[in-house]
């Protein structure tokens, strides 16, 4: 049985991992959280799972086969609001794990990184040859988020003797998403739930949403991997465009869509026309998604 510690267990991805891992007898979970009120939420979400939830100051007192780090400010609303804390929070918990690994080198560290590390305009999808381009003279909330992820990944590669996998997540969606998070799909679902017209601009874009089942499959493959220090772009079987999403939602839920001038909206994390990767390096750890976006 693999003993797995999860940092950021009350977040969107953390909840998904709990939902899958608690139903698999191969895994024993130790969850870590800073917010006791959110801990109660986890107990309510998974009442039959007998969750073990600890505070972070207890982390070093135990041993783990795997540590999964889901900590981070990820939704557009919070990135804009708390951008000054992004680097500080990410650095603190990442260092905590790195220091643990140096004393326990057999432990595997799976870190949730982001496609934002490329810090590009995403005029086209990225691949294994895409460089990271930083405009260091014009920092904003978008760059601080990217810098936080770049900082972590760089540190991980420098510690090449440690077992670390960085998973660059571009888009992820599930029933555990917070509908006030400011993501395109969460706003779309809010419109459907409230029988409201969905207003958007006339600019199309492409996204790649990994299915939770595929994501769990990827995590299992990572857990079974030994002696590795690498990064992987996460992808589904096929991406999807905004226009197709709107068409599907309109047909299935009678959603009324109003298209207005493209300059009427701006994203707090910057516009990304093709926010996905065509890298298939993850095949190295036998990952093959079954589901499209």
Predicted regions and their residues:
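Short alpha-helix in the Rossmann-fold core of NAD(P)-dependent oxidoreductases
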Residues: 82, 86-97, 101, 110, ...
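C-terminal substrate-binding subdomain of Rossmann-fold SDR/epimerase-dehydratase oxidoreductases
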Residues: 195-196, 200-293
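NAD(P)-dependent short-chain dehydrogenase/reductase
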Residues: 154-207, 212-216, 249
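Active-site Tyr-X1-5-Lys
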Residues: 137-165
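Conserved Rossmann-fold NAD(P)-dependent oxidoreductase catalytic core, especially the SDR/UDP-sugar
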Residues: 96-142
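N-terminal Rossmann NAD(P)H-binding glycine-rich loop of SDR-like oxidoreductase domains
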Residues: 4-24
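NAD(P)H-binding glycine-rich loop region in Rossmannoid oxidoreductase-like domains
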Residues: 50-91
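SDR active-site strand-loop-helix element
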Residues: 7, 32, 70, 109-115, ...
């Amino acid at each position: 049985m693999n003993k797995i510690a999860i940092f950021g267990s009350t977040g969107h991805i953390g909840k998904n991992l709990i939902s899958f891992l608690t139903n698999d007898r191969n895994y024993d979970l130790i969850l870590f959280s800073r917010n006791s009120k959110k801990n109660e939420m986890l107990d309510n979400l998974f009442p039959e799972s007998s969750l073990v939830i600890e505070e972070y100051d207890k982390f070093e007192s135990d041993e783990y086969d795997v540590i999964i780090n889901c900590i981070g400010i990820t939704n557009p609303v919070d990135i804009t609001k708390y951008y000054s804390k992004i680097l500080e929070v990410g650095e603190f918990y990442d260092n905590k794990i790195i220091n643990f690994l140096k004393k326990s080198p057999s432990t595997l560290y799976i870190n949730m990184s982001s496609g934002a590390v490329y810090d590009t305009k995403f005029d086209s999808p990225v691949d294994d040859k895409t460089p990271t381009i930083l405009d260091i003279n014009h920092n904003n909330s978008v760059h601080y988020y990217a810098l936080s992820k770049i900082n972590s990944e760089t540190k991980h590669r420098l510690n090449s003797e440690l077992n670390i996998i960085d998973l660059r997540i571009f888009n992820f969606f599930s029933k555990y998403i917070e509908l006030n998070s400011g993501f395109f799909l969460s706003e779309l679902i809010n419109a459907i739930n409230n029988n409201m017209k969905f207003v958007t601009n006339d600019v199309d874009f492409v996204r790649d949403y990994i299915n939770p089942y595929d994501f769990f499959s990827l995590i299992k493959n990572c857990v079974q991997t030994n002696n590795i220090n690498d990064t992987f772009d996460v992808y589904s079987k096929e991406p999807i465009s905004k226009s197709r999403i709107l068409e599907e939602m309109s047909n299935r839920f009678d959603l009324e869509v109003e298209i207005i001038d493209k300059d009427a909206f701006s994203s707090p994390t910057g516009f990304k026309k093709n926010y996905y990767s065509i890298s298939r390096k993850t095949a190295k750890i036998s990952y093959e998604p079954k589901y499209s976006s």
